[in-house]
Structure formats: structure tokens, C-alpha cells
Swiss-Prot record:
The keyword Signal applies. This is Arminin 524. Residues 1-18 form the signal peptide. Expressed in entodermal epithelium along the body column. The keyword Signal applies. Keywords: Amidation, Antibiotic, Antimicrobial, Immunity, Innate immunity, Membrane, Secreted, Signal, Target cell membrane, Target membrane. Its main location: secreted. GO terms for cellular component: extracellular region.
Amino acid sequence: MKAVFAILFLAFIALTYAKSYDEVKEEIKNEVEREIFEDLEEESDELDNDVEEFNDAKPWRRWRRIRWRKIVPYIPAIVKAAGKK
């Protein structure tokens, strides 16, 4: 609903400031196309992320995403704490 109001508001602004009807049509068409492309990009990004997580052919791929450089300094402390128990 917000997108519809945004498009109508932009159309009103276009009607107010445009020089001719053709310019208004072109501006509205461009705005609608831009919003549609943005929505499609967001949806495709979400679908791509879902596909990677659920249909992962390589089971170790998720472990490659871990930032080992951030974790490695803590490993000795974890081993030391686990060894004291």
C-alpha cells in the first residue's frame, strides 16, 4: 500500500512540475519500472540466499564462511578452560 501512495505522490509532483503530458507519462513509467526492478532485485537476493542455505550440495561450504582469523586467537583459551574441568 505504501508503494501505491508513493507512486501517486510522485505522479502528483510530476503533474505539478512537468511541462507536458508526455513528460508526465514518461516520468511515471520510469519511476514504476525502477520500483519494480528494485523489488525484483530484493526478491532474487532473498531467493539466492535461501537456495544456498537449503540446497547446499557441498556440506562443508557453511564452515568456509566462518571467519577463522577472528576465532583462532580464542582457541587456546577455550582448550585451556576445557582442560581444567
